[in-house]
């Protein structure tokens, strides 16, 4: 490990950055250094601008991805090297506005009913019922399901923020059936990786992607469907059912409209007053099946 890499790693860890962000930021700085065949502390804003242009023109990266690259470089120069950073010289790219693909409630029901396995069905139902991100889904623990308060506790979400989301009665029933289907009862993870004999590791996000893709194909859906699609559907369908926009914002674990670090918090009373859109779906009954 080089001295600069160690310095950056310590700065990231000291600020409690997520492991995925740490790996990404370090990889980006290493890529930047290799591009110019020089240590990153000997590169200046001119090289950063050339690198930014290359990311767009040659690598064809999306504006949101380029923003992550610049954020990594900015962290390295301002936090690790304690140097200045001129936003005017290296501005963040303007992000294109993309309208997310939204499924109707009927299409969501078709998607869930078309799940290849009961396990996949439970994953899809949990995504739609809670609006969680796929990484949050894979790291749900058994103890995160609070059937007394009817909430699901999300630990260490994006930005290392914890939050509670509503626990749909229909989802609670599905999770109990999921538990009964498991031949080996895990001690920690709600969705254990089946490839691990001891069930001591959670499933990968790849499994969640596969569950969505396979179900969409089996359901004959023409729209692009991925785990985040169900998160968008969760928010949109709640809004259509009259839920408060700020309440939805909290349930999703998003920043406020000004993109600050301040998070809104919802009271238990308001949380319980918001019904999950899963409860209004008409799903086919599935017979219990061991996993």
Give names to the regions the model predicted.
Residues 1-291:
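Conserved catalytic core of the tyrosine transesterase superfamily
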């Amino acid at each position: 490990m080089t001295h600069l890499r160690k310095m950056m790693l310590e700065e990231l860890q000291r600020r409690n950055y997520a492991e995925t962000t740490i790996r990404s930021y370090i990889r980006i700085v290493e890529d930047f250094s290799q591009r110019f065949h020089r240590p990153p502390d000997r590169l200046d804003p001119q090289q950063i601008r050339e690198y930014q242009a290359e990311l767009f023109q040659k690598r064809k990266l999306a504006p949101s991805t380029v923003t992550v690259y610049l954020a990594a470089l900015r962290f390295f120069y301002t936090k690790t090297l304690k140097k200045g950073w001129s936003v005017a010289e290296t501005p963040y790219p303007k992000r294109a506005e993309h309208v997310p693909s939204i499924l109707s409630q009927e299409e969501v029901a078709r998607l869930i009913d078309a799940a290849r396995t009961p396990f996949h069905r439970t994953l899809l139902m949990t995504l739609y019922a809670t609006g969680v991100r796929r990484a949050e889904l894979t790291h749900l623990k058994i103890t995160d399901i609070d059937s007394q308060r009817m909430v699901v506790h999300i630990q260490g979400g994006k930005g290392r923020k914890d939050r509670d989301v509503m626990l749909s009665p229909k989802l609670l029933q599905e999770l109990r059936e999921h538990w009964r289907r498991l031949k080996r009862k895990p001690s920690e993870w709600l969705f254990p990786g089946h490839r691990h004999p001891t069930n001591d590791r959670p499933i990968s996000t790849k499994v969640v992607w596969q569950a969505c893709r396979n179900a969409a194909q089996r359901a004959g859906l023409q729209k692009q469907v991925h785990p985040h699609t169900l998160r968008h559907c969760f928010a949109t369908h709640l809004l259509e059912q009259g839920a408060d926009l700020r309440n939805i914002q909290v349930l999703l674990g998003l920043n406020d409209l000004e993109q600050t670090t301040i998070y809104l918090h919802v009271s238990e009373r308001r949380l319980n007053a918001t019904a999950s859109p899963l409860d209004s779906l008409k799903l086919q009954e599935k017979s219990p099946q061991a996993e």
